[in-house]
Amino acid sequence: AIADVPQHLEVTKDYFVGSASFDEALFEIAPGIAATLVEEARVRLEAMDADALAYKQADPDYFNPYSLSIQWTLEAAAGDLISLEGFTAAYSGGAHGNYGTDARIYSLKSAKQVSLRALLTDPAAAMAESLPFVLSDIAQQRTEKVGGGASAETFRAETADAVSADTMLSGELGLVASTQAGTFGGFVVHFAPYEIGSYAEGAYKAVVPQSVFRDFLKPDYAALFAGEPVTED
């Protein structure tokens, strides 16, 4: 039963340590979606547990314990839509672990995922309008993070080689909360380590205000977007 779904999963063994946590609010407003996320996490934990055990048994001298951490948070909600952000950190041998983010938009009524594309009259045009904003935002972040004398213009050109309107549309896209309650302030696009820059630079994300793309919103969704995006400090 959905009411019995745990809000936290944990595995502790000598060869594998895993955990998964879920925003409590999800179980209140979207228990069916929460149950789906829990089951997905359970399957991933069990699969990595099995992989770790198999590797340990096959090559115990070179084996290092595996780890997997999964976290889901509710980022924004408006009307029938909610936006979730996932974070996964994993280690399965090698010089370092890997991590990445996941963004999902769900319909509360259907409990199914909804793409940002489905909210837009002309997705390609909306992304083309948003791309310059994303490139400038990432370039500024890279300038602050990496520095080294490189200019924002240099980082912008490098980012443009890795990011296009097409890759954005097929990437990890979510919605963000707004300064105006009960609406979305924009969308966020996530980039995993290696997608932009070196692994050492880490992940990046850029938030595009709804004012940039609202002319491309379908009438059924336009009222759900207003204000300015609420961003992290």
Language-model-detected regions and their locations in the chain:
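Compositionally biased intrinsically disordered regions enriched in Thr/Gly
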Residues: 1-233
